[in-house]
């Protein structure tokens, strides 16, 4: 043992000899002789510290030393001022607190002394946390720590707080304040009355979370004001208007009256208590409790008024008046009414039901329904049955109006009495499992249920709402019925099943199912535009939900397009195809119709007035269902004029009328002519006649679009359309324009000879305008009034130079040709007389020459001619043109041409 002590002593001596610092204080800095110094800390720990270097000198920075909470003074000269950088929160209860203490010891490693207001704190060292621990007594307010006269910590105890209003128990006369850090809490009481003790002492609990104050004044009602201070400083002021308060009457008040106990608060008087019962004064007994008081109530007979809801008040010490409560004698009183599910049964709860003799339900505008008492509960007829003194079973009539009802109960005593009305609500109920069928146009539905009289307690109508959801079907209710049903008008719709929800004041009360009738197809009709009209029933009005299926004989199907629909008919467009016999099935929503047909489509013509060109040309016949017509088996005539078929499709027939030659002119007259389409195929349907009058086409009347100028030979060219030469007549200023010649290739131009040419010469040619009209087949057709401007031609012009003018050469050539033609014509006349066949052959070659000339002329016109306001083409001024035109004006030649044509 001695060896151990000697070893420890040597160890301490070695530490003192070899762990001694070589640092000194120079000019406010700690200068050391070595770069690496060894320090012994307070907890016996030896640390090697590297010094800061400045040249060849070494310095120690104690403030940045990481273990300064364990660093002692280095020697007698180098002393550090202790520091407490932080301190835990200090509740007013005090206790043990651990804290960090920097530079805690002197160079001999003794703990430096710290004190609070000259009271030295005892310190201990917690080696596990390297912290010092001290104990603090309960207190409040500022908390300061100093060392050697230097303050090293300034803080405070935690501040007291009272989160809730203090509790005043006037039955015990105690005020309780609850909160935290309530050390040194005091109160001051203020009142209108004189107080014995305005500043009572409080009792603080160990946790400083509750303090109680007892005062005799708290036992009686008063209007208190209490100021609370914590740690000598005002905290808050509280008001306690503690006036008497009645809650209820205990027990049962029978007809004889008597002493009744009333419970409440602040009911202890100092002197006396008075009360009122209705309009009568009652006596009350003094009590030592603030929570109850006893008062004497008169009998119902002495009271002399209705025994329900009688107001009661008390007044304490003639100054403090309580609130008012209402009490009743022990008479029947309804407290609640509840319906059993959706039935006609209602449970009534309340008090004093044993003597009930009659019940009345009041609805609407004071409509009364008496309910008879039954000896036993029954569901067969309306009535009520008393189950106990607190419950009544009621079976209401099913035609009782829903809404807020008033229930009246008779007392059953010796005196006539009616209990107060109790308002309760009855909701209509729909009988479950109801289903209805309707046409697509809608129907009136009778919905069964109970309590279906839809009025409220004021007699006003409360409509039932019936629909299948947002955006769905609606059934608009009519006036309510006898309570067992109501009627609503179902709107148009379709579909096999719809759930209709019924709402009363937006509350769902049931539902029923509606199914619309499936569609039915009957007869069919064809329309002019090619659509098909189907007649039937329950076809609906929704085109977007409609599907028409066309079923062919081989079972193949294709959908038509429904374009219009009503409840009794629909119109659909037949699908494109080449089969005209089929059956039809119509689907509306999820329901399909019967299979109607088969029906055979007849060809139908849509354009009944296609304006057939009078001069011949292409005629387009628009229609539908030309399935079986072919070019080889079909013939078309318009009047007596044949129209040669060029093409046939399902919807169009194109045919060509030959040019209007004179030999056919009686058939090419203007006006309306019957159209006949026939087929040699016996399986081809005849054209469908929309009207008994049949189909009639009109030949287009002639029109005039422009004219040329009158040339020197009085010849004018007229441009237009449908220039047929059947009984053709042209008038210029009501004078005939003779010898008309029609362009037989286009029938859009003709030339004629102006008969009043000589008369026109007297006018100023540059300004004169003339009217032109044209008629075909003896009828005048004035498409428009056209005017043309006469332009004079220069017949001769003198040439100042020597020699003959060009016109003289032209005249000479014309004269020679004229003599030749006269000779040729005379020869032909003689040959015709003797040899007719031979002359006809010669004239036929001349006619071919004439046709070639006209064809060339027509080609030239077509190059320049357009409809509208474009000017007519200028005449060909070539020598050949003038010779040809002059020859065409010779009467003998024209007469020959005419005879040959005829």
Curated annotation (Swiss-Prot):
Transmembrane portions of the chain: 804-824
This protein's UniProt keywords: Cell membrane, Glycoprotein, Membrane, Repeat, Signal, Transmembrane, Transmembrane helix
CDD domains xref list: IPT_PCSR
The glycosylation sites annotated in the UniProt record are 43, 144, 184, 223, 272, 279, 288, 358, 389, 398, 437, 559, 628, 644, 706, 753, 764, 771, 799
InterPro entries found in the cross-reference section: Dictyostelium_Tiger, Ig-like_fold, Ig_E-set, IPT_dom
What ranges are annotated Cytoplasmic (topological domains)? Answer: 825-902
UniProt xrefs under Gene3D superfamilies = Immunoglobulins
Question: What GO molecular function annotation could you give as one example from this UniProt entry?
Answer: transmembrane signaling receptor activity
Where, in residue ranges, is this chain on the Extracellular side?
25-803
So which residues are the signal peptide here?
1-24
Q: Indicate where this protein resides in the cell.
A: Cell membrane
Locate the IPT/TIG domain: which residues? 249-323, 603-680, 704-788
Membrane disposition: Single-pass type I membrane protein
The Gene Ontology biological process terms listed for this entry are: aggregation involved in sorocarp development; altruistic, chimeric sorocarp development; cell motility; cell surface receptor signaling pathway; cell-cell recognition; cell-cell self recognition; heterophilic cell-cell adhesion via plasma membrane cell adhesion molecules; socially cooperative development
Disruption phenotype annotation: TgrB1 and tgrC1 double mutants show strain segregation in chimeras with wild-type cells.
Example of a GO cellular component annotation carried by this entry: external side of plasma membrane
Query: What other remark does the UniProt record contain for this protein?
Result: The tgrB1 gene is highly polymorphic.
Q: Which PANTHER family match?
A: IPT/TIG DOMAIN-CONTAINING PROTEIN-RELATED-RELATED, IPT_TIG DOMAIN-CONTAINING PROTEIN-RELATED
- Its job: tgrB1 and tgrC1 are involved in kin discrimination. They play an essential role in aggregation and subsequent development.
The name on file for this protein is: Tiger protein B1
Q: What organism does this protein naturally occur in? A: Dictyostelium discoideum
């Amino acid at each position: 043992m001695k060896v151990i002590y000697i070893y420890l002593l040597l160890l301490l001596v070695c530490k003192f000899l070899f762990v001694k610092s070589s640092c000194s204080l120079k000019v406010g800095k700690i200068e050391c002789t070595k770069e690496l110094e060894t320090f012994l800390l307070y907890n016996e720990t030896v640390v090697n510290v590297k010094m800061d270097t400045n040249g060849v000198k070494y310095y120690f920075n104690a403030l940045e030393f990481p273990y300064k909470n364990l660093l002692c003074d280095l020697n007698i000269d180098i002393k550090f001022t202790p520091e407490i950088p932080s301190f835990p929160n200090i509740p007013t209860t005090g206790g043990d607190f651990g804290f960090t203490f920097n530079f805690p010891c002197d160079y001999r490693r003794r703990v430096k002394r710290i004190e609070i207001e000259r009271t030295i704190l005892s310190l201990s060292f917690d080696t596990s946390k390297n912290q010092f621990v001290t104990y603090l007594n309960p207190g409040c307010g500022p908390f300061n720590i100093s060392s050697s006269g230097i303050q090293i910590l300034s803080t405070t105890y935690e501040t007291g707080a009272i989160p809730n209003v203090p509790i005043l128990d006037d039955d015990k006369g105690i005020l309780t304040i609850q909160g935290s850090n309530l050390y040194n809490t005091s109160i001051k009481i203020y009142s209108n009355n004189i107080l014995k003790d305005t500043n009572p002492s409080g009792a603080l609990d160990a946790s400083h979370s509750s303090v109680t104050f007892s005062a005799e004044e708290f036992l009686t009602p008063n209007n208190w004001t209490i100021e609370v201070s914590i740690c000598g400083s005002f905290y808050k002021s509280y008001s306690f208007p503690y006036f008497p308060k009645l809650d209820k009457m205990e027990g049962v008040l029978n007809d004889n009256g008597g002493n009744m106990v009333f419970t409440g608060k602040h009911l202890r008087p100092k002197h006396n208590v008075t009360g009122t019962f209705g309009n009568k004064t009652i006596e009350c007994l003094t009590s030592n409790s603030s929570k109850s008081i006893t008062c004497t109530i008169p009998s119902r007979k002495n009271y002399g008024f209705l025994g329900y809801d009688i107001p009661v008040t008390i007044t304490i010490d003639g100054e403090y008046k309580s609130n008012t409560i209402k009490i009743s004698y022990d008479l029947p009183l309804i407290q609640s009414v509840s319906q059993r599910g959706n039935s006609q049964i209602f449970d009534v709860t309340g008090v004093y039901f044993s003597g009930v003799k009659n019940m009345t339900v009041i609805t609407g505008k004071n409509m009364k329904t008496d309910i008879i008492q039954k000896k036993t509960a029954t569901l067969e007829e309306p009535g009520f049955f008393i189950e106990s003194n607190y419950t009544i079973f009621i079976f209401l009539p099913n035609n009782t109006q829903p809404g807020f009802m008033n229930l009246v109960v008779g007392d059953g005593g010796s005196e006539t009495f009616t209990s107060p009305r109790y308002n309760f609500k009855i909701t209509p109920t729909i009988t479950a499992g109801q289903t209805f069928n309707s046409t697509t146009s809608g129907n009136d539905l009778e919905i069964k249920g109970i309590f279906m009289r839809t009025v409220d307690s004021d007699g006003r109508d409360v409509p039932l709402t019936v629909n299948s959801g947002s955006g769905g079907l609606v059934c608009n209710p009519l006036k309510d019925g006898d309570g067992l049903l109501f009627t609503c008008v179902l709107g148009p719709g379709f579909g096999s099943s719809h759930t209709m929800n019924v709402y009363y004041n937006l509350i769902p009360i049931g539902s029923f199912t509606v199914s619309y009738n499936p569609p039915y197809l009957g007869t069919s009709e064809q329309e002019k535009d090619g659509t098909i009209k189907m007649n039937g029933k329950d076809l609906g009005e929704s085109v977007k939900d409609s599907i028409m299926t066309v079923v062919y004989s081989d079972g193949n199907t294709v959908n038509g397009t429904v374009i219009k629909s009503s409840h009794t008919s629909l119109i659909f467009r037949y699908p494109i195809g080449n089969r005209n016999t089929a059956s039809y099935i119509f689907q509306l929503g999820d329901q399909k119709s019967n299979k109607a047909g088969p029906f055979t489509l007849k060809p139908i013509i849509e354009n009944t007035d296609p304006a057939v060109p009078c001069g011949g040309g292409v005629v387009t016949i628009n229609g539908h269902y030309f399935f079986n017509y072919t070019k080889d088996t079909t013939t078309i005539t318009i009047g007596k004029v044949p129209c040669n078929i060029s093409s046939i499709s399902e919807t169009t027939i194109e045919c060509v009328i030959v040019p209007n030659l004179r030999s056919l002119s009686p058939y090419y007259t203007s006006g309306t002519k019957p159209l006949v389409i026939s087929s040699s195929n016996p399986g081809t349907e005849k054209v469908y006649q929309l009207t008994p009058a049949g189909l009639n086409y009109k030949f287009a009347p002639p029109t005039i679009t422009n004219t040329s100028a009158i040339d020197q030979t009085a010849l004018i060219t007229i441009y237009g359309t449908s220039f047929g030469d059947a009984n053709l007549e042209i008038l210029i200023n009501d004078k005939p324009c003779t010898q008309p010649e029609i362009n037989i290739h286009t029938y859009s131009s003709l030339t004629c000879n102006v008969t009043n040419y000589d008369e026109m010469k007297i006018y100023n040619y540059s300004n004169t305008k003339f009217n032109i009209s044209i008629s075909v087949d003896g009828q005048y057709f004035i498409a428009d009034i056209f005017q043309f401007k006469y332009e004079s031609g220069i017949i001769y012009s003198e040439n100042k130079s020597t020699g003959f003018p060009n016109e003289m050469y032209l005249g000479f050539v014309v004269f020679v040709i004229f003599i030749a033609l006269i000779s040729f014509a005379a020869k032909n006349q003689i040959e015709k007389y003797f040899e007719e066949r031979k002359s006809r052959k010669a004239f036929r070659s001349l006619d071919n020459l004439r046709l070639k000339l006209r064809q060339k002329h027509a080609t030239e016109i077509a190059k320049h001619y357009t409809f509208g306001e474009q000017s007519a083409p200028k005449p060909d001024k070539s020598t050949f043109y003038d010779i040809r035109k002059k020859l065409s004006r010779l009467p003998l030649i024209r007469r020959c041409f005419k005879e040959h044509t005829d």
